[in-house]
């Protein structure tokens, strides 16, 4: 969550009201926001505007940010319906992921900037193993690094009440997508790849177009819109699923991912740079990718829609944001592989997320 920051303006003449909106726009996210493989969103992908907003970053200035996201999933869904029998029988997958992202942005002009994201993750998954007992598998480390170019559509000086930021990024497969841990069989522990939801990387190069926009509606009130779509051209990454079907090897897909957010932000205390926001958020993985379409690899496609409240505080060179998206709708869609086999798809979803960010400009 980087910043291509925003103008200070408002009736108080102290901190701008818009600064806060920038924080609202990039409140996630994303490092590696994001996403849906078996636990939407499994990978945290930060929007390049960042949860930090501050001002339009001046030429030759920097902004550094640190974001965090907490995810805990224990509920299993098939389609829109929760499947409580898994939890009741002790066979549900429980996933916990702590995601961090360090972001760095450099402004070439007031309209053009570049951002670098270094994501890190620490995840664990607990489920029933073949020995009839529940065990926990763990994976963590550096995720998939992303380099992003950002451009404001209009001159900030001439358009202080609204603007659109267009970004285009490249995701490199720097995260481990073959992480292993011990899986317990009836004859003892064996090393196997961990579930795809806690793999630090997905194993593919990606292209990430983004758009973020804001518009002043009333004094101290702003509407915002933000989203990205990760295009992963690679079809499969060569890593087997955690529990391959006997006699049939199933390889993990490298799926596309997407996120969208929209809502309102209101500066409740302009003199102290304090604002509240409320909006909606959707995270997901499509059944079929833009490039390559649908494949017979292992993917857990679906989406989650959240009510997305937030708090933003901007003081001096620092901006802090906190968001707590609460799930309203969860849908585990049937994958191409499961459709061919004539079976239902199942996947875990979080009830809520906790997302925090702090940034400083130089």
Question: Each PLM stretch: what is its role?
Answer:
Residues 122-253:
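Outer-membrane pore/translocation modules
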Residues 64-70, 116-120, 166-172, 225-229, ...:
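Transmembrane beta-barrel strands of outer-membrane/channel proteins
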Residues 84-95, 108-146, 294:
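Surface-exposed loop and membrane-interface regions of Gram-negative outer-membrane beta-barrel proteins
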Residues 54, 66-68, 102-106, 116, ...:
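Residues on the lipid-exposed face of transmembrane beta-strands in outer-membrane beta-barrel proteins
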Residues 77-87, 235-362:
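Outer membrane beta-barrel transmembrane domains
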